[in-house]
């Protein structure tokens, strides 16, 4: 059970006593680490009778090059500033540098939240 509330410990190390039990709106979900591979999407129920689409695996990126957008295939993750191990494991996050059929591109979307990979070409 993921909890998005405060820490049960104070800054001094003392215990903070809870005012109430965990509520459903305070809960979070496990992250989806989007990997390079054949496209697989997952829908997750979210608040307000809506659904989120999460990309579990994907091999396609929408790359913006000036005024036009190109669909390119993702070959692998070159660099990932959020975590160096993500580049080794081919995990795509926002800010990751991808090797694509059109050249190197930097991811501008959050594939674990939006379900698709948007990127811009890197010179």
Swiss-Prot record:
Q: Which GO terms describe its biological process?
A: translation
Against InterPro entries, the record matches this protein to: Ribosomal_eS8, Ribosomal_eS8_CS, Ribosomal_protein_eS8_arc, Ribosomal_Se8/biogenesis_NSA2
Query: A cellular component term (GO) from this record?
Result: ribosome
Entry annotated with the keyword Ribonucleoprotein: yes
Specify residue ranges for compositional bias: Basic residues. 7-26
User: Organism's domain of life?
Assistant: Archaea
- Residue ranges for the region (Disordered) are 1-38
- What is a single molecular function from GO for this protein? structural constituent of ribosome
Q: Does the keyword Ribosomal protein belong to this entry?
A: yes
Keywords of this protein's UniProt record, alphabetized?
Ribonucleoprotein, Ribosomal protein
The disulfides recorded in the entry are none
Protein family according to the UniProt entry? Belongs to the eukaryotic ribosomal protein eS8 family.
Instruction: List, alphabetically, the NCBIfam families matched.
Output: eS8
Assembly behavior: Part of the 30S ribosomal subunit.
Q: What is this protein called?
A: Small ribosomal subunit protein eS8
Q: Which organism is it from?
A: Haloarcula marismortui (strain ATCC 43049 / DSM 3752 / JCM 8966 / VKM B-1809)
């Amino acid at each position: 059970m993921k909890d998005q509330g405060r820490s049960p410990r104070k800054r001094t190390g003392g215990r903070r006593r809870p005012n109430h039990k965990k509520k459903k709106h305070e809960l979070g979900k496990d992250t989806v680490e989007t990997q390079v591979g054949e496209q697989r999407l997952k829908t997750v129920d979210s608040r307000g009778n809506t659904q989120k689409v999460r990309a579990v695996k994907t091999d396609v990126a929408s790359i913006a090059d000036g005024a036009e957008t190109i669909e390119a295939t993702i070959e692998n993750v070159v660099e990932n500033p959020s975590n160096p191990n993500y580049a080794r494991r081919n995990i795509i996050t926002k800010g990751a540098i991808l090797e694509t059929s059109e050249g190197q591109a930097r991811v501008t979307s959050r594939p674990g939240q939006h379900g698709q990979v948007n990127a811009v070409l890197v010179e």
